[in-house]
Amino acid sequence: MPCAAGQNVVGIRYRIPKAGWVRFRWSRQVPQDVKSFRVTMDRAGRWHVAFAAVPDPIPGPGNGEVVGIDRGVAVSAALSTGELLCCPGLPGRQQQRLRRLERRLARAKRGSERRKQVKRAIARLKGRDADIRKDWCEKTSTSLACRFDVIRVEDLKIGSMTRSAKGTAAEPGRNVRQKAGLNREILRSGRGLLVRRLHDKAPGRVEKVRPAYTGQRCSACGHIAAGSRESQALFRCAACGNTLNADVNAARNIAAGHAVTARGGEGVARPVNREPQPVLLPTV
């Protein structure tokens, strides 16, 4: 069924094998070259129809500007331009309700209908939180791809950073609860999804920099000292006295491609997905 741009069609039904008739909202125009689609249901019980289509990459603005992005927990993305971007989450009341439901779930009897209802309510709230995070990553990645020709990020291994600290029975982990809380905040900040969407929207324009010492190096004079970062938010160079936001300082080092190897030498930014974009190919 075709759908015009800007049209919002409600009440469409689709028959899913072994599930019956499911209603869905057709809220956007479907590309003409779509040949397949997939119907899924998430843990919150919501049905989704996903159409397989590859969007065109966003062309660079051609201004030659380079931006560095420092991703963190307190600040989701600090730009070398001085901007501090924070990924939003659930509103305060919904966060409180989520915590109440989680406590109720811990008290509920396993296998009971009440426990199933609480789990569904928790899944709906967490699904809403994930939707907010995805929406922020989509809008932020689109803005960055439109504004800058080159985007540099740290080469972070999110899977290793969020690995469980429980350990084994023979060698139990330490500070397990604190590490679990940190893992949740890292995943909630959307740092991995943001970079993946940048790769998709700006192929050939995303570069990765070694993360070593980007937070301890002064972006003004290049001096490296652990004591220069006085707090999570404040960086004051022990050599030149340069003072600025610590995350912005790290982002400027990333933008310049400045990293330090284990032997003390300069790290080099390495390109990722450096295929030429069709819009940048020379005309014959």
Q: PLM ranges: what are they?
A:
Residues 1-14:
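Hydrophobic alpha-helical hairpins/lids featuring a short glycine-rich hinge
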Residues 28-35, 41-284:
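Positively charged, helix-rich recognition surfaces that bind polyanionic ligands
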Residues 10, 17-20, 32:
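"…together with the soluble PPM/PP2C metallo-phosphatase catalytic core" -> "…together
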Residues 14, 21, 45-48:
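Trp/Tyr-centric glycan-recognition "aromatic platform" motifs on solvent-exposed beta-strand/loop surfaces
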